[in-house]
Amino acid sequence: MALDQSFVGRSYPPTDPYEVGREKIREFAEAVGDPNPVYTDPEAAKALGYADVIAPPTFVFAITFKAAGQVVQDPQLGLDYSRVVHGDQKFAYTRPVRAGDRLTVTSTIESIKSLAGNDVVDVRGEVHDEAGEHVVTAITKLVARAAEEG
């Protein structure tokens, strides 16, 4: 059953602050196989004009996808989580994520489409630091696969 289009534009409360730590950045860079020293060496980061190490571009996926869970778990929307897969991801940065940042995410349903019986929901996650400054916008595409005919 197609999702209700009236949910387009609905925003959810900001998440609790997520504190970005050097160790989390290092672990993420290691996990994705990116040896760039700007992610692990404060001196390398400072040489490029950053106050501390910065995170790889996809690092924020962990917090924006978790925040998109507010949409998935909204009982009024009626999205069947057991059928949801991640379809696509885009990021638009104002500045890099840095060690020491305390980030919040505000999720908004950007669009709802029905394609071949699948529900496709785009969720915009606006990421801000503790001072309220914009850091990155993440667009997460969620696909709820059509129910199998029995």
UniProtKB/Swiss-Prot annotation:
Record-linked CDD domains: R_hydratase_like (cd03441)
InterPro entries hit by this protein: FAS1-like_DH_region, HadA-like, HotDog_dom_sf, UPF0336/Enoyl-CoA_hydratase
Domain MaoC-like: 8-126
An annotated Gene Ontology molecular function: (3R)-hydroxyacyl-[acyl-carrier-protein] dehydratase activity
Pfam families per record: FAS1_DH_region (PF13452)
GO terms classed as biological process: fatty acid biosynthetic process
Gene3D superfamilies: Hotdog Thioesterase
Family the UniProt entry places it in: Belongs to the UPF0336 family.
PANTHER family cross-referenced by the UniProt entry: HYDROXYACYL-THIOESTER DEHYDRATASE TYPE 2, MITOCHONDRIAL, HYDROXYACYL-THIOESTER DEHYDRATASE TYPE 2, MITOCHONDRIAL-RELATED
Protein name (database record): UPF0336 protein SAV_4901
Native organism: Streptomyces avermitilis (strain ATCC 31267 / DSM 46492 / JCM 5070 / NBRC 14893 / NCIMB 12804 / NRRL 8165 / MA-4680)
